[in-house]
Amino acid sequence: MSAHTSIPFRTAEDRERHASRVAVYLRDGGLVAHPTETVYGLGCALRADPLARLARLKRRGTPRPFLLLVRGAQDVPGLEWTEAAERLARAFWPGPLTLVLRATQGNFPPEVVGEGGTVAIRASPHPAVLAVLDELGEPITSTSANLPGEPPA
């Protein structure tokens, strides 16, 4: 994929045809713009170089962790699931609910770990996101596709 490639993901056929290509691009360190159920987002795989490029692209002067898009709780071992978090996930996932859970293992990159060792996760129901997550087999980071202080994209 070139530096600026647009891949159609509107239909089920598009997603089936292109999800593996997007997953390879992410594994190779690429950044992607993607739809979610709320706004457009920017994301990457959990690797040092693309995470640093994503932070620069967002012009983040101070460390602010990126959230993780997941298919479900099974995608993120190493988080402390409280009873309340489990109830919320069962009730509202997939959907626009972000849970902030304490990391119990140090296997998360610093770019996704917040104050107190927490990680924000969301199970997006958007078919494009799900197709990529299924193909990639791991979470991706996500942040809104706008600069700080600007309206969401």
Feature map (PLM): residue ranges:
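Active-site-adjacent structural elements in enzyme catalytic cores
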Residues: M1-A153
